[in-house]
């Protein structure tokens, strides 16, 4: 959840007290965020600029995350799949009738068959989907003609352990 301007975003805002994320809040977010470090980082860098306290910031993050239905192709794939960035947007629009393509930004690595890194959904302050700003321009975030969506689970049975699935890239409101 990143507060932002039309061009750019505020970050690491000064607060009366040093930003602290309680263990209970961190633990409560690990089902949708892949690590403790990321939970802490997101609040310190972006949450401090949101005007919300730590509980309010993560409550809103969860509310917006759960408001988005992740299309089946992006939930726990067991093999690498390839999509054009516009098809990623189409899938999210089809799964979420209130979304339009301009509300979604696809981010990927470099190269023609780059790996999907994030799917960003842009929201207004009141939680309504809005067109993403210039800092979410696709030519900056993902210029690949095709992107790879890798598997999120270990498929090697000989290990005897199945990896805990990571959530699909957080369609973090931006």
Segments and roles (model prediction):
Residues 1-28:
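An N-terminal structural lobe/cap that precedes and organizes the functional/catalytic core
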């Amino acid at each position: 959840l990143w507060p932002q301007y039309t061009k750019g975003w505020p970050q690491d805002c000064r607060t009366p007290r040093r930003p602290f994320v309680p263990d209970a809040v961190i633990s409560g977010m690990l089902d949708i965020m892949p690590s403790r470090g990321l939970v802490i980082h997101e609040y310190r860098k972006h949450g401090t600029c949101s005007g919300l306290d730590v509980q309010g910031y993560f409550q809103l993050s969860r509310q917006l995350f759960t408001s988005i239905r992740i299309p089946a192709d992006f939930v726990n794939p067991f093999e690498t799949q390839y999509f054009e960035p516009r098809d990623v947007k189409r899938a999210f629009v089809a799964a979420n009738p209130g979304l339009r393509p301009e509300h979604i930004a696809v981010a990927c690595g470099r190269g023609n068959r780059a790996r999907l890194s994030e799917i960003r959904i842009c929201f207004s302050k009141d939680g309504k989907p809005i067109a993403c700003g210039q800092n979410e321009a696709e030519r900056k975030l993902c210029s690949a003609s095709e992107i790879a969506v890798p598997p999120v689970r270990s498929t090697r049975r000989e290990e005897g352990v199945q990896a805990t699935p990571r959530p699909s890239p957080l369609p973090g409101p931006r």
